[in-house]
Each structure stands twice: as structure tokens, then as C-alpha cells.
């Protein structure tokens, strides 16, 4: 689960991480009230959306007067923000963050992330802050230091010495940097964070390290342990079908293809995406109905996939061990019989009650094609999608 910047800063502030003052407003009236109370005459105004690239795509405005701040608030609130990270077209801007301008001496990058290569959390540091870290990693990998942490977020003294030397922090700045890194690691571990990114971390002209921008992602599977974080979920920042899938208890991820997929089991679902790609097609979604889905959940799954207008073909790939094929068939038929236009459907059923499942579909008269293997099904689905 992604947090907005202001939510990430709220969480970091609870660990005494140094952050400049900031305010969040959701209307022009709130902006006017803030200016009146605070006397702000210069600030940076930033859209609050779950996407990067805000500065490059008009989502950040530097205002150098009170009137300029209000104009920025009016311009940004309600906009449809788009960047290279908004795959579904745009994200609505319902809130903006306002923070005073800071006199910057130098910018840094600091992050704690889960790293598959090291199979543990890692601390990443770079003196090339304020930039696209992916570009830095590609063009100048020597500018990034990666230090593996323990699974419980501990960082050793020798690693702290490595970090401060690499970042060229000395004296009081070194002390600030050490404390900051410890706090970030603690926040990461205690809140089941999968990504904690500070970009930029700045050194001010007064010699103070401050977090200017932050990004935090929480492990969805651990949210039950953090009710204080679970309530921060913002459905407006997600694909409508993603939100609906969460409500009905399905594992769904929207993709960019035109072949709708309904599969049981995450492994089989991933394999289905791969084999479609192998045959020249592209899946419109990842959807795992699991092993114990009810007929109602199957109906909801079919309706969910078909609500995507880009879907030209439906590929159902079920290997029924725990899953009952007749339940899948009944759910499919219940939805298809209510639709004016039926999407071409390719079905591969194997396992528990497979013959009964096929009989239910065939007796309904809905247009579909049964196949005997995933390979054959993928090939046929791709042909129909062209």
C-alpha cells in the first residue's frame, strides 16, 4: 500500500526524523486560511498522488509570494495528474502539500528497500540526490552505495562508518546522518515497510540535514498488524477494478493487454501470462480466484474482468484440486446469460468435477471453446484477440 507524501512524513515525524514544516490543504479556502494564520510568503506546493515524476510533469510549483501560493493551490487542486508512472491515464489531485522553501547546500538520496538480490533489506545511499535514481544506477552505478541490513532492521557500526564516509559527512553533519539512518531503519522494520525512499535529503546552508520528499510503501500482507496505517488507504489513487477486487477478496492486477484471464493459483496465473506472451498476446489482467472461491466470487470475478472495455477475449484456465470446476462453470454461465454481447471465451478445465463443469457450460448455450491444455488455450485466445 502506497502512502501519500504527507502521510509518509507524518510517519517519519513520529520517529523524530528532521522534516521542514508542512501543511496539507484540500480546498482554496483552506489555503487562504493557512496563509492568513502562518504568514507564508514563499513555499513549494506539491500534488499528493501515488506517482513519481511530479516535478517533471507540472505537479510541483515553487511560489515566491502569498498570492503565488494561492494561485498554485487553485491550479493544482482538482487537476488530473499524469506522468510515466500513471499507467491508467491520470490520478485525481484531491490534496496538496505546502512547505516553506529551504536554502539548500547539497542534495542526497537515502532509501531502505527490500532487495531480492541480497534477500534482505538494504540501505541505499547516493550523493546524487534530487535526480532519477534509476538513471544514476544505469549511468553511474559507482555513485550508489548499497549496504545489506539484518532482517530486523539493524545496521552495524562499521556500516554506519562506511555510509558517512561515502556521503562525505563530517562533524555535526555526520552525527545527524548516523541518527537519521538509524531512525529510517527502525521505521522500516517496525511498520513492515517494503520501500522507504528519501529524495532528496538535503543539507541546508545552516548545516542541517532535512527530508524534503519521502515515499513509503507498506507491505499489504502486514496491514492487519498496523490498523493506524491501514486507515490511510486511498482508493481514489487506484484502478477502480483493483479497488473492487480488494472489496470482494480477489487478487487482481490490471495490465495493458486485451485478453482477460481468470485463473486459480498465483503460480498458474503467472504461467498463464507468460504463455500468452510467448504466443504473441498480452493479458489484460492478473486474477487469482484462489482455491476455495464460491460461485458468487466467480461471478464477481467474471464481471470484474469483463468490465474492462479493452478485453476482447476471456481465457479461463482452471486446474481444480480444491477448486470445484462445476462452481467455476456455474459462475461463468450466471454472468454470461445476463450480457447482451458475449465476449469470445476459451476454457481450459481440469480436475474436480470437470465433466460436470463442461456439461453446465455446454447446456447453457453460451459461445465458448473448450481446450485440453493451457498451451492450446493460450494459442487460441491469442488468435481470437488479434
Curated annotation (Swiss-Prot):
<feature type="domain" description="ATP-grasp">
    <location>
        <begin position="9"/>
        <end position="244"/>
    </location>
</feature>
<keyword id="KW-0816">Tricarboxylic acid cycle</keyword>
<feature type="binding site">
    <location>
        <position position="107"/>
    </location>
    <ligand>
        <name>ATP</name>
    </ligand>
</feature>
<dbReference type="GO" id="GO:0000287">
    <property type="term" value="F:magnesium ion binding"/>
</dbReference>
<dbReference type="InterPro" id="IPR005809">
    <property type="entry name" value="Succ_CoA_ligase-like_bsu"/>
</dbReference>
<feature type="binding site">
    <location>
        <begin position="321"/>
        <end position="323"/>
    </location>
    <ligand>
        <name>substrate</name>
    </ligand>
</feature>
<protein>
    <recommendedName>
        <fullName>Succinate--CoA ligase [ADP-forming] subunit beta</fullName>
        <ecNumber>6.2.1.5</ecNumber>
    </recommendedName>
</protein>
<dbReference type="InterPro" id="IPR013815">
    <property type="entry name" value="ATP_grasp_subdomain_1"/>
</dbReference>
<comment type="function">
    <text>Succinyl-CoA synthetase functions in the citric acid cycle (TCA), coupling the hydrolysis of succinyl-CoA to the synthesis of either ATP or GTP and thus represents the only step of substrate-level phosphorylation in the TCA. The beta subunit provides nucleotide specificity of the enzyme and binds the substrate succinate, while the binding sites for coenzyme A and phosphate are found in the alpha subunit.</text>
</comment>
<comment type="subunit">
    <text>Heterotetramer of two alpha and two beta subunits.</text>
</comment>
<feature type="binding site">
    <location>
        <position position="213"/>
    </location>
    <ligand>
        <name>Mg(2+)</name>
    </ligand>
</feature>
<feature type="binding site">
    <location>
        <position position="102"/>
    </location>
    <ligand>
        <name>ATP</name>
    </ligand>
</feature>
<dbReference type="InterPro" id="IPR011761">
    <property type="entry name" value="ATP-grasp"/>
</dbReference>
<dbReference type="Pfam" id="PF08442">
    <property type="entry name" value="ATP-grasp_2"/>
</dbReference>
<dbReference type="GO" id="GO:0042709">
    <property type="term" value="C:succinate-CoA ligase complex"/>
</dbReference>
<comment type="similarity">
    <text>Belongs to the succinate/malate CoA ligase beta subunit family.</text>
</comment>
<dbReference type="GO" id="GO:0006099">
    <property type="term" value="P:tricarboxylic acid cycle"/>
</dbReference>
<dbReference type="GO" id="GO:0004775">
    <property type="term" value="F:succinate-CoA ligase (ADP-forming) activity"/>
</dbReference>
<feature type="binding site">
    <location>
        <position position="46"/>
    </location>
    <ligand>
        <name>ATP</name>
    </ligand>
</feature>
<keyword id="KW-0479">Metal-binding</keyword>
<dbReference type="InterPro" id="IPR013650">
    <property type="entry name" value="ATP-grasp_succ-CoA_synth-type"/>
</dbReference>
<feature type="binding site">
    <location>
        <position position="264"/>
    </location>
    <ligand>
        <name>substrate</name>
    </ligand>
</feature>
<feature type="binding site">
    <location>
        <position position="199"/>
    </location>
    <ligand>
        <name>Mg(2+)</name>
    </ligand>
</feature>
<comment type="pathway">
    <text>Carbohydrate metabolism; tricarboxylic acid cycle; succinate from succinyl-CoA (ligase route): step 1/1.</text>
</comment>
<keyword id="KW-0460">Magnesium</keyword>
<dbReference type="Pfam" id="PF00549">
    <property type="entry name" value="Ligase_CoA"/>
</dbReference>
<dbReference type="InterPro" id="IPR005811">
    <property type="entry name" value="SUCC_ACL_C"/>
</dbReference>
<keyword id="KW-0547">Nucleotide-binding</keyword>
<feature type="binding site">
    <location>
        <begin position="53"/>
        <end position="55"/>
    </location>
    <ligand>
        <name>ATP</name>
    </ligand>
</feature>
<dbReference type="GO" id="GO:0004776">
    <property type="term" value="F:succinate-CoA ligase (GDP-forming) activity"/>
</dbReference>
<dbReference type="InterPro" id="IPR016102">
    <property type="entry name" value="Succinyl-CoA_synth-like"/>
</dbReference>
<dbReference type="GO" id="GO:0005524">
    <property type="term" value="F:ATP binding"/>
</dbReference>
<dbReference type="GO" id="GO:0005829">
    <property type="term" value="C:cytosol"/>
</dbReference>
<dbReference type="GO" id="GO:0006104">
    <property type="term" value="P:succinyl-CoA metabolic process"/>
</dbReference>
<dbReference type="InterPro" id="IPR017866">
    <property type="entry name" value="Succ-CoA_synthase_bsu_CS"/>
</dbReference>
<keyword id="KW-0436">Ligase</keyword>
<keyword id="KW-0067">ATP-binding</keyword>
Amino acid at each position: 500500500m502506497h502512502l501519500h507524501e504527507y502521510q509518509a512524513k507524518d510517519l517519519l515525524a513520529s520517529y523524530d526524523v528532521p522534516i521542514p514544516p508542512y501543511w496539507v490543504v484540500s480546498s482554496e479556502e483552506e489555503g487562504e486560511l493557512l496563509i492568513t494564520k502562518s504568514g507564508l510568503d514563499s513555499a513549494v506546493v506539491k500534488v499528493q498522488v501515488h506517482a513519481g515524476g511530479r516535478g517533471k510533469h507540472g505537479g510541483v510549483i515553487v511560489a515566491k509570494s502569498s498570492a503565488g501560493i494561492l494561485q498554485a493551490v487553485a491550479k493544482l487542486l482538482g487537476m488530473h495528474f499524469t506522468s510515466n508512472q500513471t499507467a491508467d491515464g491520470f490520478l485525481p489531485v484531491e490534496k496538496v502539500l505546502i512547505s516553506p522553501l529551504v536554502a539548500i547546500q547539497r542534495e542526497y538520496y537515502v532509501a531502505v528497500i527490500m532487495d531480492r538480490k541480497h534477500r534482505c533489506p538494504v540501505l541505499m545511499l547516493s550523493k546524487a540526490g534530487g535526480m532519477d535514481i534509476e538513471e544514476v544506477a544505469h549511468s553511474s552505478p559507482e555513485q550508489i552505495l548499497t549496504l545489506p541490513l539484518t532482517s530486523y532492521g539493524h545496521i552495524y557500526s562499521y556500516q554506519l562508518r562506511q555510509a558517512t564516509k561515502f556521503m562525505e559527512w563530517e562533524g555535526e553533519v555526520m552525527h545527524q546522518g548516523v541518527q537519521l539512518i538509524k531512525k529510517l531503519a527502525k521505521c522500516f522494520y517496525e511498520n513492515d515497510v517494503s520501500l522507504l525512499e528519501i529524495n532528496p535529503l538535503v543539507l541546508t546552508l545552516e548545516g542541517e540535514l532535512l527530508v524534503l520528499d519521502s515515499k513509503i510503501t507498506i507491505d499489504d500482507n502486514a496491514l492487519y498488524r498496523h490498523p493506524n496505517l491501514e486507515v490511510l488507504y486511498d482508493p481514489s489513487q487506484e484502478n477502480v477494478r483493483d479497488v473492487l477486487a480488494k472489496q470482494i477478496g480477489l487478487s487482481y492486477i490490471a495490465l495493458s493487454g486485451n485478453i482477460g484471464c481468470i485463473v486459480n493459483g498465483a503460480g498458474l496465473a503467472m504461467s498463464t501470462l507468460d504463455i500468452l506472451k510467448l504466443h504473441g498476446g498480452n493479458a489484460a489482467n492478473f486474477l487469482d480466484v484462489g482455491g476455495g472461491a464460491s460461485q458468487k466470487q466467480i461471478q464477481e470475478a467474471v464481471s470484474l474482468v469483463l468490465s474492462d472495455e479493452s478485453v476482447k477475449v476471456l481465457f479461463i484456465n482452471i486446474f481444480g484440486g480444491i477448486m470445484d470446476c462445476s462452481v467455476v462453470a456455474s459462475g461463468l454461465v450466471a454472468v454470461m446469460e445476463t450480457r447482451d454481447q458475449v465476449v469470445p471465451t476459451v476454457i481450459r478445465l481440469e480436475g474436480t468435477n470437470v465433466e460436470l463443469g463442461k456439461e453446465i457450460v455446454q447446456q447453457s448455450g453460451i459461445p465458448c471453446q473448450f481446450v485440453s491444455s493451457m498451451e492450446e488455450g493460450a494459442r487460441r485466445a491469442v488468435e481470437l484477440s488479434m
